[in-house]
Amino acid sequence: MPKAKVTKNSIAPVSSNPSANRTPVKINSTGTPMWYKVIMFAFMLVGLLWLVANYLVGPQIPFMNELDAWNYGIGFGLLIIGLLMTMGWR
């Protein structure tokens, strides 16, 4: 009668409780400081408010009227800075 092939899985001892072999690891994570979160959300909020103000009252505000299409760059730039900061948020 032919014999079955021996595989690595059949040789290795199988533990009934796989977590018994593991040692607990402490995660030393303090999280993101409060000032980082405040600045991140402030960038996003100011960018959004800049775009809304440009849309609603842009022609009536002299310096926003002079910036013309740069208002979109400023507004979206502030939003993008806030969104890029979310990658550092833990």
Swiss-Prot record:
One of its GO terms (biological process) is cell division. Belongs to the CrgA family. Residues 7-26 have a biased composition (Polar residues). This is Cell division protein CrgA. The chain crosses the membrane at residues 38-58, 69-89. Residues 1-26 are annotated as: Disordered. Keywords: Cell cycle, Cell division, Cell membrane, Membrane, Transmembrane, Transmembrane helix. The keyword Cytoplasm does not apply. It is found in: Cell membrane. Its main location: membrane. It is a multi-pass membrane protein. The keyword Flavoprotein does not apply. InterPro entries: CrgA. Disulfide bonds: none annotated. It comes from Corynebacterium efficiens (strain DSM 44549 / YS-314 / AJ 12310 / JCM 11189 / NBRC 100395). GO terms for cellular component: plasma membrane. Pfam families: CrgA. Involved in cell division.
